[in-house]
């Protein structure tokens, strides 16, 4: 079974997504937990946030 980090990375492989799209594709019911995890992953460099488009994508 995939953990939440793997689910998020799998969801973002196709294209950059907004927070609600990430939650829907990764099947995460709690917005706050999802956003908190995305922020941790951003700090680690695994994902990035485009402030102009409001979308998350896999870090380079």
Where would I find each of the regions flagged by the language model?
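Glycine-centered, phosphate/nucleic-acid-interacting loop/turn motifs that mediate DNA/RNA or nucleotide
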Residues: 45
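Short acidic, hydrophobic short linear motifs in intrinsically disordered regions
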Residues: 17-26
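Short, leucine-enriched amphipathic alpha-helices that occur as contiguous helical runs
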Residues: 1-9, 31
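Short helix-to-turn junction characteristic of helix-turn-helix DNA-binding domains
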Residues: 11-15
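Residue-level "edge-of-site" marker
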Residues: 25, 36, 54-55
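Short amphipathic alpha-helical interaction segments
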Residues: 29-40
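Short, cationic-aromatic polyanion-contact patches
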Residues: 2, 49-60
């Amino acid at each position: 079974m995939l953990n939440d980090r793997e689910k998020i990375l799998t969801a973002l492989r196709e294209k950059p997504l907004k927070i609600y799209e990430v939650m829907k594709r990764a099947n995460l019911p709690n917005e706050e937990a999802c956003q908190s995890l995305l922020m941790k992953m951003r700090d680690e460099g695994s994902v990035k946030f485009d402030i102009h488009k409001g979308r998350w994508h896999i870090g380079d």
